[in-house]
Design a protein with these regions (language model features):
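Rossmann-like dinucleotide-binding core of oxidoreductases
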Residues: 117-118, 139, 153-156, 288, ...
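Active-site/ligand-binding neighborhood in enzyme catalytic cores
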Residues: 147-252, 262-265, 282, 286, ...
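Short glycine/proline-rich turn/loop motifs
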Residues: 16-18, 69-71, 145-150, 210-222, ...
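Central helical "cap/lid" subdomain
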Residues: 251-252, 257-328
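N-terminal glycine-rich phosphate/pyrophosphate-binding loop and immediately adjacent elements
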Residues: 12-145
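Conserved flavin/dinucleotide-binding core of flavoenzymes
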Residues: 4-11, 34-35, 43, 264, ...
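Active-site rim elements
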Residues: 72-79, 149-158, 218-228, 301-309, ...
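Charged, often glycine-rich, active-site loop that binds/positions anionic groups
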Residues: 113-120, 192-195, 254, 260-265, ...
Length: 477
């Protein structure tokens, strides 16, 4: 919670700090923050964006490979051109070269015993008949249940009273179905089913149009299109369109004083105070724990912030000399019940002659992988890739390098990604809108607050648009 001593110390240093003013201060220069700032500036209001990092982009971060040929996304990496209209508009605006996700060929699955089998993309894995029938039943049940929820205001106390694991058990899910659903939560949120409210997870699915659409690699799905230049293209483009001086990098916010008595909010950052009429914060909820608020946030917001959790979620990009998996008839998509990678996807860039498998390390197997030495991490993934694609004899010869970034060590993402989760009991007791509702002169954006495509870039952009509309309306009336 907000520490009054810390707050007093922050405020006491105000007399030594330099100051300036703006109509609106936006905290965070990711997609939500930059979108909000763009819209505020378009309305002829002055704006300052305070970003803790030394770069823009937030959880979109693209890096060139060491040889200068090809780019990998350490963070968010997919969009689509059907129902992610706002981020797709940015792709067109900034001349993104789009790469369609490969779904031609077989997928591979690794079962709980380590056995490997393959199946065509879009079909169920090659389980026995009873297991296959139950996986389809549980999948369709989750799809149907998530579709009954209101996207912005889900309300089901029964679903929120239990974990997603308990929900599955109450529906008689088989061992194979439980393992399949665990792959979903690990790949989507880096968490185990036991740690997530059933209501929260199902609403998360609904925010992306449903479980099937959110997990799909085909048109309209959550993983349909990549950008050759990398997804940070959008944030860099938005930043380049801002007037000079709007974005302040390396400026972490330490305190927000909404109790000045003069109608202005004071935002404290590194020896400087910025006074504003309105503040839009777009940082992840775990980061809000590190900001002192005066007065403190309302109980509903404070409880939500203290309740959110990240699991373990990291992408490891394995670069190879050739797309040997394609030559063997695979599309590159795999799932595993045991890990280390729960899901693998082909993220190659043919135009750059770069052949890449992105391994998603999430949840319990992710934590185990993180505890390994760098050499053992690499070897464990090479072994798994060799097994999944029947390439144990060539995988090490084909291997070039591993590229990764551990968001769990990133202070300004809140020590995790892609999106926080909630345990049972929070949504129903606080109300689904508690986090995004304005309070005093503070407005809340970021992909966590989104109704549609929560946890995705589309959700971030839409949340920034919403927050901008809120402040513009209040400042213009």
């Amino acid at each position: 919670m907000s520490n009054s001593l810390e707050t007093n110390e922050s405020m006491r240093s105000a007399s030594q700090a330099t100051s300036e003013e703006a109509d609106v201060v936006v905290i965070g220069a990711g997609l939500a923050g930059l979108t909000a700032a763009r819209d505020v500036i378009k309305s002829d209001l002055s704006c300052i964006v305070l970003e803790a990092r030394d770069r823009v982009g937030g959880k979109t971060w693209s890096q060139q490979l060491p040889d200068g040929k090809g780019t990998v996304d350490l963070g968010a990496a997919w969009i689509n051109d059907v129902n992610q209209t706002q981020v797709y508009a940015l792709a067109k605006q900034y001349n993104a070269e789009l790469i369609e996700q490969n779904t031609t060929g077989n997928c591979a699955i690794q079962d709980a015993s380590g056995g490997i089998s393959s199946f065509p993309y879009g079909e169920l894995p090659s389980f026995d008949a009873a297991a296959k029938e139950d996986v389809a039943r549980i999948r369709d049940m989750c799809e149907a249940d998530c579709q009954t929820l209101d996207t912005f205001n889900p309300d089901d106390k029964t679903l929120d009273s239990m974990s997603f694991e308990a929900y599955l058990q109450s529906r008689g899910a088989s061992e194979t179905s439980m393992s399949t659903a665990t792959v979903w939560t690990r790949a989507m949120l880096g968490q185990e089913p036991k740690d997530l409210s059933a209501l929260y997870f199902l609403n998360y699915c609904k925010s992306g149009g449903g479980l099937l659409q959110m997990r799909s690699d085909r048109k309209g799905g959550g993983q349909h299109l990549r950008v050759r230049q990398g997804m940070q293209l959008f944030s860099k483009g938005l930043a380049s369109d801002m007037p000079d001086g709007v974005i302040r990098l390396s400026s972490p916010v330490t305190a927000i004083n909404n109790n000045t008595g003069n109608g202005a909010v004071e935002i404290h950052t590194k020896g400087q105070i910025v006074r504003a009429r309105k503040v839009i914060t777009t940082v992840p909820t775990p980061v809000l724990k590190n900001i002192s608020f005066s007065p403190d946030l309302p109980t509903s917001k404070r409880t939500w912030i203290e309740s959110t959790t990240y699991g373990y979620y990291t992408k490891a990009m394995m670069v190879f000399r050739t797309p040997f998996w394609v030559d063997k008839g695979f599309c590159g998509l795999t799932q595993s019940f045991i890990g280390p990678a729960g899901v693998i996807r082909d993220t190659s860039s043919p135009a750059d002659n770069k052949h890449i498998l992105t391994c998603f390390l999430g949840g319990k197997p992710g934590f185990a992988w993180a505890a390994l030495s760098n050499a053992d991490r690499e070897q464990s993934l090479l072994k798994q890739i060799g097994q999944l694609f029947d390439a144990e004899d060539i995988v090490e010869k084909e291997f070039v390098q591993l590229v990764t970034y551990e968001w769990i060590r990133d202070e300004y993402s809140g020590w995790g990604c892609p999106c926080t989760g909630l345990p049972p009991g929070v949504l129903s007791s606080l109300g689904a809108g508690s986090l995004r509702e304005p309070w005093a002169d503070l407005h809340f954006a970021g992909t966590e607050t989104a109704g549609e495509w929560k946890g995705y870039m589309e959700g971030a952009v839409r949340s920034g648009q919403r927050a901008a509309v809120e402040v513009i309306k209040e400042l213009r009336t």
